[in-house]
A protein has these predicted regions:
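N-terminal switch/interaction subdomains of large nucleotide-dependent motors and GTPases
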Residues: 1-168
Length: 168
């Protein structure tokens, strides 16, 4: 498994770099602020690390389970949803909001504005940079990366759908 870094160069990311790069993505999409912890994992993960006969890192498997799905649609006043939603509202990745059809106001998105939208101990802008770089280190193509972001913004926009009943 080989990846290029976020910068346009011929330098290859090592397998170790790729394994480490999974963390910002797992945290962005799996961690949220709860009443007790600003960066609480809302899913389980099992990481199996493989070594070759010489004791060198040869690969890893990550299995996720039990994602707290209800957190997407509702949060308590002192909590917030998954970090990625708040990261995507930051300017770190220049045209992200435009490409994902997001406004500049987090309060336009009911699913993610019911609780805290800012947390003093979390820098959403910096964390978005880490997440974006991690996608690149993990060999996501530009199209794949933007599809992930667009899917995430679609979830944010789903909270704005209104049901209308028609009587015939």
């Amino acid at each position: 498994m080989v990846a290029t870094s976020g910068k346009k160069s011929d330098k290859k990311a090592s397998l170790e770099d790729q394994i480490v790069a999974t963390n910002p993505i797992l945290e962005s999409y799996g961690n949220a602020k709860t009443s007790r912890n600003d960066n609480s994992s809302r899913f389980g993960k099992f990481i199996r690390i493989h070594f070759n006969a010489a004791g060198k890192l040869a690969g890893c498997d990550i299995e996720s389970y039990l994602l707290e799905k209800s957190r997407i649609t509702q949060q308590q006043e002192v909590e917030r949803s998954y970090h990625i939603f708040y990261q995507m509202m930051q300017p770190a990745v220049g045209d992200l909001k435009k490409k994902c059809l997001l406004s500049n106001d987090i309060y336009d998105y009911h699913y993610v504005s019911q609780g805290k939208t800012k947390v003093q101990s979390i820098d959403d802008n910096e964390d978005l940079e880490f997440t974006h770089e991690a996608f690149q280190v993990l060999c996501f193509s530009e199209e794949e990366m933007w599809n992930v972001y667009k899917g995430t913004s679609a979830v944010m926009n789903l909270g704005e759908l209104v049901s209308i009943k028609f009587h015939c």
